[in-house]
Swiss-Prot record:
The keyword Membrane applies. GO terms for cellular component: cAMP-dependent protein kinase complex; centrosome; ciliary base; cytoplasm; cytosol; dendrite; dendritic shaft; dendritic spine. The inactive form of the enzyme is composed of two regulatory chains and two catalytic chains. Activation by cAMP produces two active catalytic monomers and a regulatory dimer that binds four cAMP molecules. Interacts with PRKACA and PRKACB. Interacts with the phosphorylated form of PJA2. Forms a complex composed of PRKAR2B, GSK3B and GSKIP through GSKIP interaction; facilitates PKA-induced phosphorylation and regulates GSK3B activity. GO terms for biological process: adenylate cyclase-activating G protein-coupled receptor signaling pathway; fatty acid metabolic process; learning; modulation of chemical synaptic transmission; negative regulation of cAMP/PKA signal transduction; response to antipsychotic drug. This is cAMP-dependent protein kinase type II-beta regulatory subunit. InterPro entries: cAMP-dep_PK_reg_su-like, cAMP_dep_PK_reg_su, cAMP_dep_PK_reg_su_I/II_a/b, cNMP-bd_CS, cNMP-bd_dom, cNMP-bd_dom_sf, RmlC-like_jellyroll. Pfam families: cNMP_binding (PF00027), RIIa (PF02197). Residues 53-97 are annotated as: Disordered.
């Protein structure tokens, strides 16, 4: 069955996506409602303008013939210009209590959003040297605090985040100094450490202030993600300090490391016996919904008897699998016996997802452990077609339980 994409849908969604990336709204649904409502209102105004123009022509003719009053159309030329500011992670000012919807420049066609081709595999790790700008402990702590809520960095693992912090350099600015200028090529992404800044957008050659930053926020990442000129001028209105990240380092850390991580996840998925029947496209979907979790030494990952909500693949570290036997005591204080250990690339927790039964065993971290996790909803949505194949492995697990405990039902029942 072929599905025809309605005309204009792609451009509509692309425009909305860019606005979300620029403004990073806390309430995405409210932002979407305001965004599309505004678009609808603008279309209605344009229709009214066309109707008004036709009405004015008819009215002028009527006035010439019979002295009638000319009808009035909509005069957009008298309306103030509204425009976007370049705002990747704009934070609300301390006194602001509500989210303000972004404004759109209705007179300028949206510029193309594109980027030069970039292949992370073309760079060799051996040829790269890690960029480090020395920082004091206080500077590093302030920088880490400033970066913790930036969307671009939320999915970075601790090692990648450490690389970002090392590579960021401090830029001191004076009052009145231009940090970036509208139309210039984007070279750096900036995080505000301290200071106030105004956002200016040129309209008919005249710059107009459309917003400001007050000791927090970030800007410039759109120019690093896409090959597009700066959309605004940022001017310091007080002495301040910024942390900058250059284009090359940004692309290497964010893009290349994510590409390497994705390949690693794909290799993990390919190695799982119960997923071997999946097509390549299906495996890629699995990779898209996988999340990562880090556990400290001795921390419980899953508990025997709990309801199953996800299964895990060990990315790094070692996991200890234990099981309690009903009515029997063991040498361990908690009455559990160790039945297995999982290392890098091995998985656990999938049996409960197949059988819809409570967890049959517990898992604890040995040292620091990083796991890939897929929740049960995504599991059922994506892996439904291969459930029967997965169930073929149940016999193997039941044989292991029988060998260990004499029966495959000899586990502690979950307590209410």
């Amino acid at each position: 069955m072929s599905i025809e994409i309605p005309a204009g849908l792609t451009e509509l969604l692309q425009g909305f996506t860019v606005e979300v990336l620029r403004h990073q709204p806390a309430d995405l649904l409210e932002f979407a409602l305001q965004h599309f409502t505004r678009l609808q209102q603008e279309n209605e105004r344009k229709g009214a303008a066309r109707f008004g123009h036709e009405g004015r022509t008819w009215g002028d003719a009527g006035a010439a013939a019979g002295g009638g009053t000319p009808s009035k159309g909509v005069n957009f030329a008298e309306e103030p210009m509204r425009s976007d500011s370049e705002n990747g992670e704009e934070e609300e000012a301390a006194e602001a209590g509500a989210f303000n919807a972004p404004v759109i420049n209705r007179f300028t066609r949206r510029a193309s959003v594109c980027a030069e081709a970039y292949n992370p595999d073309e760079e060799e790790d051996d040829a790269e040297s890690r960029i480090i700008h020395p920082k004091t402990d206080d500077q590093r702590n302030r920088l880490q605090e400033a970066c913790k809520d930036i969307l671009l960095f939320k999915n970075l693992d601790p090692e990648q985040m450490s690389q970002v912090l090392d590579a960021m350099f401090e830029k001191l600015v004076k009052e009145g100094e231009h940090v970036i200028d509208q139309g210039d090529d984007g070279d750096n992404f900036y995080v505000i450490d301290r200071g106030t800044f105004d956002i200016y957008v040129k309209c008919d050659g005249v710059g107009r202030c459309v917003g400001n930053y007050d000791n927090r926020g970030s800007f410039g990442e759109l120019a690093l993600m896409y090959n597009t000129p700066r959309a605004a001028t940022i001017t310091a209105t007080s002495p301040g300090a910024l942390w900058g990240l250059d284009r090359v380092t940004f692309r290497r850390i964010i893009v290349k490391n994510n590409a390497k991580k994705r390949k690693m996840y794909e290799s993990f998925i390919e190695s799982l016996p119960f997923l071997k029947s999946l097509e390549v496209s299906e495996r890629l979907k699995v990779v898209d919904v996988i999340g990562t979790k880090v556990y400290n030494d001795g921390e419980q990952i899953i508990a025997q008897g709990d309801s199953a909500d996800s299964f895990f693949i060990v990315e790094s570290g070692e996991v200890r699998i234990t099981m309690k036997r009903k009515g029997k005591s063991d040498i361990e204080e908690n009455g559990a016996v160790e039945i297995a250990r999982c290392l890098r690339g091995q998985y656990f927790g999938e049996l409960a997802l197949v059988t819809n039964k409570p967890r049959a065993a517990s898992a604890h971290a040995i040292g620091t452990v990083k796991c890939l996790a897929m929740d049960v909803q995504a599991f059922e949505r994506l892996l439904g077609p291969c459930m029967e194949i997965m169930k073929r492995n149940i016999a193997t697990y039941e044989e292991q339980l029988v060998a260990l405990f004499g029966t495959n039902m000899d586990i502690v029942e979950p307590t209410a």
